[in-house]
A protein has these predicted regions:
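Cytoplasmic helix-loop-helix junction between adjacent transmembrane helices
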Residues: 113-152
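Structural signature of the two symmetry-related core transmembrane helices
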Residues: 85-99, 302-321
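Extracytoplasmic gate region of multi-pass secondary transporters
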Residues: 36-37, 230-287, 347, 351
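Helix-breaking motifs and short loop linkers at transmembrane-helix boundaries and internal kinks
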Residues: 48, 82, 103-109, 120, ...
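Juxtamembrane intracellular "pre-TM" segments in multi-pass secondary transporters
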Residues: 4-11, 207-237, 261
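Conserved MFS/SLC helix-loop-helix module at the cytosolic interface between two early adjacent transmembrane helices
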Residues: 69-108
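Extracellular/periplasmic helix-loop-helix junction of adjacent transmembrane segments
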Residues: 39-68
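Helix-loop-helix hairpin linking two adjacent transmembrane segments in secondary transporters
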Residues: 148-202
Length: 434
């Protein structure tokens, strides 16, 4: 009993240290996955793409398809190995895949290597969700997921300007080594993930983040029939499909969209994309705290989880449409930034509800939801690329973004966020009380 109490005390005392490291891994992952966006036209030229919009769109989409298809296997691995061990393995593999992508010789090799990196990253966020469900109680969970989402958004926000600055700084080295600067960028981006994996393994002990409560060998089998026939989970997956499809705009086509529709430079497109991303960071942080505050004040999952999601996604859709009618680029960016704020403000509900639904199988349920999200994220770049290739109108991407966010709001309006999918308690219920 004393050993169990000591473990519970270590979980409580170390939870924010674990959360900080998880946020750092999220930022690293999002910086790496957005590495192709800013130098997209350079890569297409150097690797002799036949059709820029179609070929680059298909590579971006392949990343998300690979990521989506590995979600459930990644979640299953996290539930079996525990978040600590699984996350370190995933991080090392995806960082090495990023390094290999620097040696791509053409469209096919880049597509395969980028898809491999996506597959390796697939287990990261099921692991993070499992960890948060393990160490945070219900009344603190939205702020924790909001901070994790902020880590993702920070990575996505700084990725464009970071890539643009690095690409400029790497010009002399590129000339000295007689190699393309985007290759050096990918090689450079592989380093933080490897360093993070070593730090996480050293700092976060099994006592701070236990694999799971109880004996893994006696864990009951997952009721897959209930999983695939649950209406609430179906709606949760649907909202993730549309939300992720919309938000991937910022990490794929947005810099190029600004270059094509507003005539800005590569560096300026990175800066403006980062500004929009900052709105997303602030939205994630404030949304998580606001959601938990509403839950403590009202005790209502409907208001605290569902309510802010409906308002956030609906407002985002409206603001994105309004941005199209602004002739001034800075007014347009301001509206898009506010739209990103609203989307991430409400977006924290998805992760929070998934952790609640998951009970003692958080990673599996979360990864199921995230799989559908990444199918949506995979379809958006290729659909946007196809629209531009067919019409030559880059503004259609903006309306595509607004449309999917509006549908996302409808999904949330129909979703009941209460209860757990398997009727069990959450892993944190007995050992992560505040």
């Amino acid at each position: 009993m004393s050993s169990e109490l000591e473990t519970q005390a270590q979980i409580r005392s170390g939870r924010y240290q674990v959360l900080l490291l998880l946020c750092a891994s999220a930022a690293i992952a999002y910086i790496q996955r957005a590495a192709l966006s800013v130098p997209a036209q350079e890569i297409a030229h150097d690797l002799h793409f036949i059709d820029f919009a179609r070929d680059m769109g298909s590579i971006q989409s392949l990343w998300y398809f690979a990521y989506a298809m590995m979600q459930i296997p990644g979640g299953w691995i996290a539930d079996r190995l525990g978040a600590r061990k699984a996350l370190v393995i995933f991080c090392v593999v995806w960082s090495l895949a990023t390094l290999l992508a620097a040696f791509a010789t053409g469209y096919r090799t880049l597509a395969v290597l980028w898809g491999l990196m996506g597959a390796a990253q697939a287990g990261a966020f099921p692991c993070a969700a499992k960890a948060l469900g393990r160490i945070f109680p219900e009344t603190h969970r939205a702020r924790a997921t909001g901070m994790l989402a902020a880590g993702m958004t920070i990575g996505g926000a700084i990725a464009p300007i970071l890539a643009a600055l690095f690409l400029e700084a790497l010009v002399p080295t590129s000339q000295l080594l007689s190699t393309e600067r985007w290759r050096l960028l990918l090689a450079l981006y592989a380093i933080p993930g490897l360093l993070w994996a070593a730090l996480f393994w050293y700092v976060v002990s099994d006592r701070k983040l236990p694999a799971s409560e109880g004996n893994q060998a006696h864990r009951p089998a997952i009721d897959w029939m209930r999983l695939v026939t649950s209406l609430p989970l179906g709606l949760l997956c649907a909202q993730q499909f549309f939300r992720a499809a919309g938000m991937v705009f910022f990490t794929t086509w947005f810099p190029t969209f600004l270059q094509k529709t507003r005539g800005v430079s590569q560096l300026d497109s990175g800066v403006l994309t980062t500004i929009a991303g900052i709105g997303g960071v602030v939205g994630s942080l404030t949304g998580g705290f606001c959601s938990d505050w509403i839950l403590r004040k009202t005790g209502s999952q409907r208001l605290s989880r569902q309510g802010i999601a409906v308002v956030g996604m609906g407002a985002c859709s409206l603001l994105i449409v309004l941005s199209y009618f602004c002739n001034d680029i800075y007014q347009s960016i301001a509206l898009i930034t506010l739209g990103a704020f609203c989307a991430t403000f409400g977006g924290v509900s998805g992760y929070t509800v998934a952790i609640g639904f998951g009970g003692k199988n958080v990673a599996t349920v979360f990864s199921t939801m995230n799989m559908f999200g990444n199918i949506g994220a995979a379809l958006f770049p290729i659909t946007a690329g196809w629209l531009v290739a067919k019409t030559g109108n880059w503004n259609l991407i903006l309306f595509l973004f607004a449309g999917v966010m509006a549908i996302d709001a409808v999904c949330w309006a129909m979703l009941n966020p209460q209860g757990t999918l398997f009727g069990d308690e959450n892993e944190s219920d007995s050992n992560a009380s505040s």
